Amino acid sequence: MPRSLKKGPFVDDHLLKKVEAQNARGTKNVIKTWSRRSMIVPEMIGHTIAVHDGRKHVPVFITEAMIGHKLGEFAPTRTFRGHVKEDRRSRRG
């Protein structure tokens, strides 16, 4: 179930303060964050936010189409290496 509209979007305070500070200065430096749960708000458009995936920080450039989604959606946590192709020669027995 989605979040109630009367509550508004959830964004961690420390992340929002960093974005607003960069907007006030007019800079667009990469912002490192562990806050995968924060929702993307219009103030973040044009910024690059490095979202932690459990191992490293994945840079995510924020566009208008991403508004309303959470940061964690754009930094996958699992690495799929593909299924191993079955080799007929190795199955002979």
From Swiss-Prot:
Gene Ontology CC, one term: cytoplasm
InterPro entries per the UniProt record, alphabetical: Ribosomal_uS19, Ribosomal_uS19_bac-type, Ribosomal_uS19_CS, Ribosomal_uS19_SF
Alphabetic keyword roster: Ribonucleoprotein, Ribosomal protein, RNA-binding, rRNA-binding
Entry's Gene Ontology BP terms: ribosomal small subunit assembly; translation
An example Gene Ontology molecular-function term: rRNA binding
Keyword Acetylation listed: no
SUPFAM superfamilies named among the record's database cross-references: Ribosomal protein S19 (SSF54570)
Keyword flag Lipid metabolism: no
Biological function: Protein S19 forms a complex with S13 that binds strongly to the 16S ribosomal RNA.
PANTHER family: RIBOSOMAL PROTEIN S19P FAMILY MEMBER, SMALL RIBOSOMAL SUBUNIT PROTEIN US19M
NCBIfam families: rpsS_bact
Protein family: Belongs to the universal ribosomal protein uS19 family.
HAMAP family listed in its UniProt record: Ribosomal_uS19 (MF_00531)
The protein, known as: Small ribosomal subunit protein uS19
Organism classification: Bacteria, Bacillati, Actinomycetota, Actinomycetes, Acidothermales
